Design a protein with these regions (language model features):
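N-terminal beta1-alpha1 cap of cysteine-dependent amidohydrolase-like domains
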Residues: 1-89, 93-99, 220, 224-284
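Active-site phosphate/pyrophosphate- and oxyanion-stabilizing loops and adjacent acidic/basic residues
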Residues: 29-33, 109, 160
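Active-site-adjacent pocket-lining segments in enzyme domains
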Residues: 113-115, 136, 140, 147-158, ...
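A glycine-centered loop/beta-turn motif at secondary-structure junctions
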Residues: 180-241, 253
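Short glycine-/acidic-enriched loop or helix-start segments at secondary-structure transitions
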Residues: 17-18, 56, 79-80, 112-114, ...
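Glycine-rich, phosphate-binding/catalytic loops in enzymes
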Residues: 23-25, 84-88, 119-120, 174, ...
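Cysteine-nucleophile active-site neighborhood
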Residues: 73-139
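Pocket-forming structural segment of enzyme catalytic cores
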Residues: 10, 117-209
Length: 284
């Protein structure tokens, strides 16, 4: 049976329009592209609760899905508002339905909040471009989410959120100098695996985000000036076209976890193989 996955696009319409103008697709479509790269047979639906109440396809409900995943977002949990509370409410419904649940970046704070944890702005500031020296904990090295992943790696990263308190019973799976980078926990009838970075991102996505954030990244001290920011984005666009460009890979300190798409996408692949596809087989 074909597995059915619900992709929850965390961005609002204005942000998605800017993404699409820069890359040709928005965060929801980009996530579907990553999922289908791993398994072309997947049936994927996209909902966008930042805009309005969720409308599933006719005759379909949460119980009809074998997995739910939340994309990244330029929103921040602690700012509140309807475009955020609708997503947290949807996460609670996913937990109640017992559907396998995954989140990239924004998806982790949403699920943590839904399950009773706490999210704040990171006192260390924004993490942008590539999360460095992400290190698996002992639990992470043993967890199916990270099967085949190096014990220390870098990953596409864009976030200001910080997990100040995990839900009861949660397990830390990976950390770096900026804080928690991955966790797993159960809540209500469901189980969540999540990462604070973007395994689904291409180099193009990071370049487009750098251009979208613009001078804010200079003000925050991520880049010396706008010329340095533009050079960074230009390098990543070149890597998108030439992913084996050794001088650029060296310049940005990118190891095998970024050079090899199989490793970059390992967390999503492992979630599909370990949880989603078995759920689809049981559902019949």
């Amino acid at each position: 049976m074909t597995a059915r996955v619900l992709v929850v696009d965390g961005n609002n319409a204005a942000i998605r329009a800017r993404q699409a103008a820069a890359t040709g697709y928005d965060s929801g479509v980009g996530y579907v592209n990553a999922l289908r790269r791993l398994d072309p047979s997947l049936h994927c639906d996209v909902v966008r609760p930042a805009d309005a109440a969720v409308q599933f396809p006719a005759g379909v409900g949460l119980a009809d899905y074998d997995g739910v995943t939340i994309t990244g977002s330029a929103l921040n949990i602690y700012n509140g508002g309807a475009e955020i509370t609708r997503q947290v409410d949807l996460a609670r419904a996913v937990f109640d339905a017992g559907v396998p649940f995954f989140g990239s970046c924004w998806g982790l704070p949403v699920a943590v909040t839904a399950a009773g944890g706490e999210v704040r702005a990171n006192p260390r500031g924004r993490e942008f471009g590539f999360g460095r020296r992400i290190t698996l904990t002992e639990a992470g090295r043993a967890h199916r989410l990270f099967a085949g992943k190096p014990a220390v790696f870098e990953a596409p990263t864009i976030h200001l959120d910080y997990i100040a308190r995990l839900p009861e019973g949660a397990v830390e799976l990976a950390t770096n100098d900026m804080g928690l980078q991955a966790a797993a926990f159960s809540h209500a009838r469901g189980t969540f695996w999540g990462v604070q970075y973007h395994p689904e991102y291409e180099y193009l996505d990071i370049a487009a985000a750098a251009e979208r954030y613009g001078v804010r990244l200079v003000t925050e001290g991520m880049f010396a000036d706008e010329a340095a920011l533009a050079a960074f984005a230009r390098d990543l666009r070149q890597l998108q076209a030439r992913p084996d460009d050794a001088p650029l890979l060296w310049r940005h300190g990118l190891g095998t976890a970024m050079r090899d798409p199989t490793l970059r996408l390992a967390e999503i692949r492992n979630w599909l193989d370990a949880v989603v596809l078995p759920h689809a087989r049981r559902r019949g």
